[in-house]
């Protein structure tokens, strides 16, 4: 007589979403709510908080906050000091000096802290639909391949950081990086004439993937179908009212 055996269900890979937060608590909270509303109820969210004025203090279920508001995890002053010839004409804005470089350093640290991989989601986006298909472990990345970044004099492309799955085990196995001290955004000697000073967020990642083909492959998705993006400069102190107006305009995506 044959005994009935219960088939074990295949365990789904962990769904991890990471947000780098910088002074936008209202937007970050709405971004998480939009994730929950569009199929991400059980996704775990990690917030890496680099704020110097408006930290993320909201307690939310399934959300872990890594507090770097005083440089506890990444000391940006010490990191920037490693680049004494950095050029403030690239990658600097009032209230956010070398923000892109700091963002890249943060995502590289997240590769260490979340070694199974994750979807990087910016704090100033609201989702329109589920992002389940981004979690494709057969790919090294899933996201939008911007072949040439606008206003980049060297036409360097990048994987847009607004919404991008990164298969960290696959990427690290082939030596890919998110931050590379030799390919940065404004940190190197030579200023605007140095091509290696024009690697914005996601540029090093894309270049390393292309250099490792076919060992590393990625999937291009038009993320415009998945999100509304507030736009650049959402972290600036003088746009609080614009945050409110934008969230009100798109309240159907997060409320």
Spans of model-derived segments:
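N-proximal low-complexity "stem/linker" segments adjacent to membrane-targeting elements
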Residues: 2-33
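Short, charged/polar "capping" segments at the starts of alpha-helices
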Residues: 26-28, 52-58
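Short, acidic, metal-binding catalytic loop of nucleotide-sugar glycosyltransferases
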Residues: 34-42
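Short beta-strand/loop segment that forms part of the nucleotide-sugar
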Residues: 42-53, 67-71
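Active-site-proximal specificity loops/subdomain of glycosyltransferases
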Residues: 55-113
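Short beta-strand-to-loop acidic/aromatic patch adjacent to the donor-nucleotide binding site
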Residues: 116-126
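Conserved catalytic core of nucleotide-sugar-dependent glycosyltransferases
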Residues: 127-203
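Catalytic core and acceptor-binding pocket of nucleotide-sugar-dependent glycosyltransferases
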Residues: 172-246
């Amino acid at each position: 007589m044959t005994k009935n055996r219960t088939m074990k269900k295949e365990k789904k890979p962990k769904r991890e979403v990471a947000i780098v937060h910088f002074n936008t608590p209202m937007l970050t909270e709405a971004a998480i709510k939009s994730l929950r509303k569009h199929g991400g109820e059980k996704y775990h969210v990690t917030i890496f908080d680099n704020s110097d004025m408006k930290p993320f203090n909201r307690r939310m279920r399934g959300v872990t906050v890594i507090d770097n508001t005083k440089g506890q995890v990444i000391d940006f002053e010490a990191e920037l000091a490693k680049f004494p010839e950095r050029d403030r004409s690239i990658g600097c804005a009032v209230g956010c000096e070398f923000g892109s470089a700091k963002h890249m350093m943060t995502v590289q640290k997240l590769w260490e802290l979340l070694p199974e991989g994750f979807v990087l989601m910016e704090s100033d986006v609201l989702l329109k639909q589920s992002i389940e298909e981004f979690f494709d472990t057969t790919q090294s990345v899933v996201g939008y391949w911007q072949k040439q970044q606008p206003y980049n004099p060297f036409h360097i492309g990048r994987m847009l950081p607004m919404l991008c799955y990164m298969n960290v085990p696959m990427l690290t196995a082939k030596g890919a990086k998110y931050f590379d001290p030799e390919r940065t955004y404004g940190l190197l000697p030579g200023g605007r004439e140095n091509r290696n000073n024009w690697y914005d967020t996601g540029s090093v990642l894309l270049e390393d993937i292309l250099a490792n083909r076919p060992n590393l492959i990625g999937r291009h998705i038009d993320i415009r179908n998945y999100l509304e993006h507030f736009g650049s400069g959402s972290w600036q102190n003088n746009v609080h009212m614009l945050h409110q107006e934008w969230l009100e305009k798109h309240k159907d995506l997060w409320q």
